[in-house]
């Protein structure tokens, strides 16, 4: 997942996501020239070496603009029984534990939670008990691209994976992560959320209003002929593709990895984006949409 752009409604010109990184590097520099851990380093956690590496990996995703909902790591110190991690501290912002059973949990918060779960899935990191923090931020408009899917949302809350979450390595299916959401049945019912087994199906069915309108126009494309290659074994979920439907080529997005027998599951719309269907296709009948990828991932809102 990559974060494209964000703008705030405060007087400052720097978007929140950029200001966050600016504050991080300033405080980290302050720490490096100091002989003690200052007041901004009071969020710490002692973990084994493996878990420390997972937190560092997630922090690196945020610094690279490929994720949003993980705490930045200031420093890692070795000790006899593992490592101590020093995390980002939002010194001028309210930070609370997120109660996912809150009656009025907004859709932008739900979207951020699922985006966090997707990043964990992509990096084969799991937890038996996911916990999240809510940080109050200036009202911001945030645009994220998740593979080829672009989502835009307004929010006054940054959702972070809580440092109280115990992480470990595990290669699991997408549904194992999404089970965290479907397990909260009251939330699913109140917000009219649909259970899915695939992340990109979740984004389309439950956050349709957050998908960039420019991106949705892609689902209106129909062609009789293309000269792009077939997809291959390494094609990832969330890739824009052409599929054959009633002698026409229409746009879809892959939901699954390509199976050993060269089958891939694709979600597509035959009416331009109003009703979506899911089918399995042979890779012989699915073609890349390279000429549209730049258009979909370079949206700057």
From Swiss-Prot:
InterPro entries, A to Z: Poxvirus_L3/FP4 (IPR005007)
Pfam family, one: Pox_L3_FP4
Recorded family membership: Belongs to the poxviruses L3 family.
Protein name: Protein FPV130
Organism of this sequence: Fowlpox virus (strain NVSL) (FPV)
């Amino acid at each position: 997942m990559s974060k494209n752009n964000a703008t705030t409604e405060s007087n400052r010109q720097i978007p929140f996501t950029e200001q966050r990184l600016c504050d991080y590097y300033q405080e980290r520099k302050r720490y490096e020239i100091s002989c003690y851990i200052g007041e901004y380093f009071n969020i710490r956690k002692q973990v084994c070496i493996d878990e420390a590496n997972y937190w560092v990996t997630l922090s690196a995703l945020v610094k690279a603009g490929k994720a949003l909902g993980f705490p930045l790591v200031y420093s890692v110190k070795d000790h006899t029984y593992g490592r101590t991690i020093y995390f980002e501290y939002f010194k001028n912002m309210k930070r609370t534990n997120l109660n996912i059973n809150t009656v009025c949990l907004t859709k932008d918060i739900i979207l951020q939670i699922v985006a966090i779960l997707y990043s964990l899935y992509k990096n084969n990191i799991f937890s038996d008990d996911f916990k999240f923090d809510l940080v109050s931020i200036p009202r911001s408009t945030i645009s994220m691209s998740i593979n080829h899917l672009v989502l835009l949302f307004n929010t006054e809350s940054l959702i972070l994976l809580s440092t109280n979450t115990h992480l470990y390595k595990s290669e699991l299916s997408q549904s194992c992560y999404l089970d965290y959401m479907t397990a909260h049945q009251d939330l699913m019912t109140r917000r009219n959320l649909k259970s899915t087994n695939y992340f990109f199906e979740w984004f389309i069915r439950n956050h349709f209003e957050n998908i960039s309108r420019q991106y949705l126009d892609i689902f209106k494309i129909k062609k009789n002929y293309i000269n792009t290659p077939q997809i291959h074994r390494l094609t990832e979920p969330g890739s824009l593709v052409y599929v054959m439907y009633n002698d026409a080529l229409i746009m879809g997005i892959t939901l699954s990895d390509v199976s050993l027998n060269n089958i891939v599951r694709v979600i597509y719309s035959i009416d331009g984006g109003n009703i979506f269907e899911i089918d399995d296709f042979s890779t012989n009948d699915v073609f890349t949409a390279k000429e549209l990828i730049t258009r979909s991932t370079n949206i700057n809102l």
